Structure formats: structure tokens, C-alpha cells
Design a protein with these regions (language model features):
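Membrane-interfacial helix termini and the short, flexible loops that connect transmembrane helices
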Residues: 1-86, 90-93, 97-171, 175, ...
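Conserved small/polar residues in nucleotide/adenosyl-binding loops
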Residues: 305-314
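Final/C-terminal transmembrane alpha-helix of multipass membrane proteins
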Residues: 288-304
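Hydrophobic residues within alpha-helical transmembrane segments
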Residues: 208, 212, 250, 290-293
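Alpha-helical transmembrane segments of multipass membrane proteins
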Residues: 95, 213-217
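Alpha-helical transmembrane segments
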Residues: 45-53, 248-257
Length: 315
């Protein structure tokens, strides 16, 4: 008699596809387009790449969904989806780790050294490289501005985005963004519980609330950027403070937008096609994992770019 350990399960092997290669080229276009769009030369490339990415993913996901609904998935294939999503989220963690590492280095190593701490002396570092340098974060003046004044291209902001400079906490957008995002983490969990109870109506309701909160966050983020540019003078030309601020918050905001679209896709599948059961709902689970990851990551940008400021090094 053949033992249970030797019983082989059927494994569905998809047909060969060029979709991964097309997606890779589309993502490459997005990267080059975004880099060149800063100088005003890559906007068209960026939009072409974004359209190609969205179209490719939509087509790819539709194929996977059809295969799942046709019963072609096996436990082995489902495990490969789980591991694939886990590695994808891990790679995203490494992205954020690199950006936070850069900000940590600037704030905790570079600025104190320029201020006279560490192996470099103030006379060698600060006085030669930047005579008017003040070892505080965020720097409100750029090296070019200290030399050229109003003729400088890169200028520090008139005000910063940190909590201590806010006069009215009720209008402080990062606070509302935090409330919105943490609330959405709770609502997506409630939706998951409803799905496990096979309550589709409640699942659709709470998932819809989560999607709405996701796009509210994106809108509030856009309003905050407008306020930074129009009223605070904080732009990408505001030196290291401007670049790190917009890199971290913008990169996170992009992930919120992607996560919102991901959740919206699951809502449409459930509401329009009655996809998902209390036992089989990995598409939603993957979206919820990604969303919880986005929520947790937000704590770091809001702490470093909105709460902790003006760390002064005494000379």
C-alpha cells in the first residue's frame, strides 16, 4: 500500500506567458519617467509606463482570477501565492528601510559631525564647507542660499511641517491622516471577520468603508503637499529637508494609492461577481496584508517628518 507521504496532488501549470516581461518593461518606464519628470522631460514616459503597469496588472489578475474560479488552484499553488506575497511585502520593507536609513544618517550622523561632533572638527567640516551652518533639524536654509541669498535656486522653507510649529492642532493634516489610516486598518479587519462568518453584506460594507478611507488619505496628502508648496515654501528645491520629506511621504502615499486600488478590486469582485467564500479568499487576504503593512509603515514617516524636530548639537 502506498503511504500518505507518497500521494501526489495534481499541480496546475499555467501556460507560458509574456506578461511578466511586459510588466518589467512597464515598471522600467515608470522608473525612468519619474526620474526624468523632475526635470520636466519624462512626463510622457511616466504616463505611458503607468498606463502599461495598470493595464498589465489588470490583465494578469483577471487571468489568475479566472483560473481560481475554474477550480484550477491547488494547495501547492496557493502556498506559492502566499510565499510570493510575503516576499513582495518584505521587498517593500527594504525599500522603506533604505529611505529611513538615509534620513537617519543625515539627522544623527551628518548633522552632528558638521556641528563639531565625531572625528571631524568644526573648523574642517562646518567652517570650510558651510560657514553659516546650524546643527539643527530640519535645516531652514540651504548652502547655496547662505552664499547667494535670494538669488539662490535652492532655498529653505519659510516654515516646517513639524508639530511644534502648528498653531491649530485641529487643522494639522498629518493628525487626520493618521486617524484615517489607523481607522482603515480596523475596518479592513472587521471586513475580514465578516467574510470568515460568510456575511457578504457586512463584508462589502466594511471593505467599502476601507476603500473610502484609503482615497480620503490620498486626498488629504495632496492637500498637505499643496499647503507645503503654496504656503510653507517647502518644495523639492528646499535642500535635504525637502527631498527627504517628499521622498518618504510621497513613496508611502503611492503605496496607499496602490493599496486602495488593490482593495477596490476585491470589493468589485465580491459585490459584482460574488467571489470569495469563508474558506477561499486569498485575493482579499493578500490585499489586507498589504494594507496592514502600509498602515504600520506610516508610523515611521509621520514620526520622523512631522513629530521629531529641531535636534540641536551644542558646539
Amino acid at each position: 500500500m502506498e503511504s500518505k507521504s507518497h500521494i501526489h496532488q495534481k499541480y496546475y501549470v499555467p501556460e507560458q506567458s509574456s506578461i511578466p516581461i511586459i510588466f518589467a518593461f512597464a515598471a522600467l518606464l515608470v522608473g525612468f519617467g519619474a526620474a526624468n519628470a523632475i526635470t520636466g522631460n519624462g512626463t510622457i514616459m511616466l504616463w505611458i509606463g503607468m498606463i502599461a503597469v495598470v493595464g498589465t496588472l489588470a490583465f494578469w489578475w483577471s487571468i489568475i482570477t479566472k483560473e481560481s474560479q475554474a477550480g484550477l488552484d491547488t494547495p501547492q499553488l496557493n502556498n506559492s501565492y502566499v510565499y510570493g506575497m510575503a516576499w513582495f511585502i518584505f521587498s517593500e520593507v527594504m525599500f522603506f528601510f533604505a529611505f529611513f536609513g538615509a534620513l537617519f544618517y543625515i539627522r544623527n550622523i551628518a548633522i552632528p559631525w558638521l556641528g563639531g561632533e565625531g572625528p571631524t572638527a568644526k573648523g574642517l567640516a562646518g567652517e570650510l564647507l558651510w560657514p553659516d551652518f546650524e546643527p539643527t533639524w530640519p535645516p531652514m536654509i540651504t548652502p547655496e542660499q547662505s552664499l547667494l541669498g535670494e538669488n539662490a535656486v535652492t532655498k529653505g522653507p519659510a516654515e516646517n511641517m513639524y508639530l511644534h510649529s502648528i498653531r491649530d492642532l485641529g487643522t494639522w493634516l498629518p493628525l487626520w491622516n493618521t486617524i484615517v489610516l489607523l481607522s482603515s486598518s480596523a475596518t479592513v479587519h472587521v471586513a475580514h471577520l465578516a467574510l470568515k462568518e460568510n456575511n457578504r453584506k457586512r463584508f462589502n460594507f466594511w471593505l467599502g468603508i476601507t476603500v473610502a478611507l484609503a482615497f480620503i488619505f490620498v486626498i488629504l496628502q495632496a492637500v498637505e503637499y499643496y499647503e507645503a508648496y503654496a504656503h510653507l515654501g517647502l518644495t523639492l528645491n528646499s535642500g535635504v529637508y525637502g527631498t527627504t520629506f517628499f521622498m518618504l511621504t510621497g513613496f508611502h502615499g503611492m503605496h496607499v494609492l496602490i493599496g486602495g486600488i488593490f482593495l477596490l478590486t476585491q470589493l468589485m469582485r465580491s459585490a459584482n461577481y460574488n467571489h470569495f467564500t469563508d474558506k477561499e479568499h486569498f485575493g482579499f487576504e493578500a490585499a489586507s496584508w498589504y494594507w496592514h503593512f502600509v498602515d504600520v509603515v506610516w508610523v515611521c514617516p509621520v514620526s520622523y517628518t512631522h513629530l521629531r524636530a529641531h535636534e540641536t548639537t551644542d558646539n
